[in-house]
């Protein structure tokens, strides 16, 4: 599994011959790329409807959309998407096969609206676990899994459900504070999840979410977690598994 971070919450995940793009937003200072610089992915995954997560979704409307039904409906009307998983999207707790990958939609603790003033509901906010095989009740160390937490606060569900059941190997966690978890809470999340690697995201894009990533690294080390902090530069890749 190949992971690439394009800044903010935008990630590209390659599983076998399948390419997935999560929360496309290239108007952030961590990337030098424009949407036109990328090949169209097979799937676009949207965690929620805020502008900094869907701003460039329309540039990849040839892909199959993975999002809540409410957000799928909006994206079909406004971003030009014509295809969604299951014909209408998915919802929390569901798992769908996406080419060579499996995608499980997880809970996120955040607000969710779209358009100016956020007056249009985009359904429940979400995170995603992208894995090489379908999640099973029994532990499966051979199933490589990447967790994108979306925009969220620290949740007990990370410790009780996502960690023990979905077993993420790599966790991408919002750490910019103000709108989401800060570095300390993100470090606790990494510990609860039992991930091997944890990367901060959703930071340094706007003044309210500027942080020193050393705070995340230090906080993670202080938890005694087994997770290794991975602080990527924009457009940098990481091979998992």
UniProtKB/Swiss-Prot annotation:
GO terms of molecular function: hydrolase activity
Keyword Hydrolase: yes
Coiled-coil annotated spans: none
Domain of life according to the entry: Archaea
Pfam families the record matches: Lactamase_B_2
InterPro entries cross-referenced by the UniProt entry: Metallo-B-lactamas, RibonucZ/Hydroxyglut_hydro, UPF0173, UPF0173_UPF0282_UlaG_hydrolase
SMART domains: Lactamase_B
S-S bonds: none
Keywords for the protein's UniProt record, in alphabetical order: Hydrolase
PANTHER family in alphabetical order: UPF0173 METAL-DEPENDENT HYDROLASE MJ1163, UPF0173 METAL-DEPENDENT HYDROLASE MJ1163-RELATED
Family membership: Belongs to the UPF0173 family.
Record protein name field: UPF0173 metal-dependent hydrolase NP_2132A
